[in-house]
């Protein structure tokens, strides 16, 4: 790591009881859930209009960070996923969620030699970069991660074709509303997904799919203004996001084997 290692924070990859790295099934399912939700919003925007109006109204409200917009997200997810009618009185009850029919296993253990320490690099829209004193244990590029995806067809009709189409729409939205605003950033391919805690807020949020590029920037900026702490001088690092045309105004990168790449980008193969 070099001389700076004394001041460097190292974030470890999650490991099983035997010390082997793996990806929790809950993380993979959460990623798929977000992608499927974004797909439904893009394809059926009209049915989300009321929820969108509620979200627009509530974004400016002062709430504890732990509950900020939680009711809004619950409302939006209920529209997309709660279709089982097991509890007709409470549509939002988890027993009505069709994603109960999607079971994702933890990944198979990953060889410890397939971990590499990567420094976090933040790239700005104009291409400027700066690194921060955090190293992450990351899975090496090109490593195959195996997991089992089981769909109970009696509960939901999500199949391979729907998942691939959802991923394609997700990448199109992410490329257009986010990556395109960063000089030199590589677009995601149609079968790419983004996984992991270090990949950034924009890859995990629905606001661009719901509001589009222009209004999505303002919406996400306002969310970050309400949830991210101000700097010591009282300024907020996301205040100028609207003027920059993208929010957040940072894309997460790293350098591995002399090549720069976006954090968390994976190719999804179902077979």
Protein language model regions, located:
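Long, hydrophobic/aromatic-enriched structural stretches that serve as scaffold segments
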Residues: 1-21, 33-34
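Short, conserved phosphate/pyrophosphate- and ester-handling motifs at nucleotide-, phospho-/glycolipid
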Residues: 25
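Short active-site loop/helix that positions an aromatic residue
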Residues: 31-42
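Short, glycine/acidic-rich hinge or "gate" loops at secondary-structure transitions
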Residues: 41-83
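Transmembrane alpha-helical segments of multi-pass membrane glycosylation machinery
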Residues: 81-86, 108
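Basic polyanion-binding and macromolecular-assembly surfaces
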Residues: 92-271
């Amino acid at each position: 790591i070099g001389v700076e290692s004394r001041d460097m924070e190292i974030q470890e990859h999650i490991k099983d009881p035997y010390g082997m790295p793996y990806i929790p099934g809950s993380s993979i399912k959460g990623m798929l859930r977000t992608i499927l939700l974004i797909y439904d919003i893009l394809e059926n925007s009209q049915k989300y209009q009321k929820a969108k109006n509620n979200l627009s109204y509530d974004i400016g409200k002062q709430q504890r960070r732990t509950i900020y917009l939680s009711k809004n997200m619950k409302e939006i997810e209920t529209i997309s996923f709660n279709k089982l009618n097991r509890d007709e009185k409470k549509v939002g009850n988890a027993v009505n969620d069709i994603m109960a029919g999607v079971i994702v296993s933890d990944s198979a253990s990953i060889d410890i030699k397939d971990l590499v320490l990567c420094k976090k690099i933040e790239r700005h829209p104009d291409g400027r970069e700066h690194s921060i004193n955090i190293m992450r244990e990351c899975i090496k590029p090109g490593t195959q991660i195996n997991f089992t995806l089981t769909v109970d067809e009696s509960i939901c009709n999500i199949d391979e074709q729907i998942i691939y189409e959802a991923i394609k729409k997700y990448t199109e939205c992410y490329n257009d509303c986010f990556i395109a605003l960063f000089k030199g950033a590589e677009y995601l391919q149609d079968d790419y997904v983004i996984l992991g805690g270090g990949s950034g807020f924009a890859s995990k949020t629905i606001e661009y799919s719901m509001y589009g590029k222009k209004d999505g920037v303002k919406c996400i900026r306002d969310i970050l203004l309400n949830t991210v702490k101000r700097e010591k001088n009282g300024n907020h690092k996301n205040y100028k996001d609207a003027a920059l045309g993208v929010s957040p105004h940072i894309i997460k990168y790293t350098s591995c084997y002399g090549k720069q790449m976006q954090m968390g980008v994976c190719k999804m193969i179902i077979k």
